[in-house]
Amino acid sequence: MTALELVDPDRLSLFRYGVLTWIDKDGFPFSVATDFLLSENGEILLKKPSAHPTMMGADVAVLFNHITGIPTGGYTDRRYMLVWGRVSEDKGFLKLHPEEVSEWDEKVLPFDKLCAAAVPQGKKYLESLQPSIDA
């Protein structure tokens, strides 16, 4: 599956940077912010972090997000895109090979409706924990 089949380049272009996360060789999560660009054929190219431990071929997550603070308090214009996949070296960049995407944009789905939609999943999760709490 290509990046264009999973990731809408128009929506991705609304973000200025990504946060690249992977599990390092010692088993700990490692995250670093990085710039990115979209190639003419829709590939997601991440700028290599200056100190980038080996992550080639490993599962990675890249979080692209945006939030605007309101001077009087609170936030607006919230959105994110989380892309799971793998990276490979490509002409001085890290090419992201997307495998799964989740995203949210409050202009499409307001925050209160997002929370309401998550209630069944949260309830199922809490019910699965109940036996261990009762023990």
Where are these regions (language model features)?
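Binding-site signature for planar aromatic cofactors or substrates
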Residues: 1-135
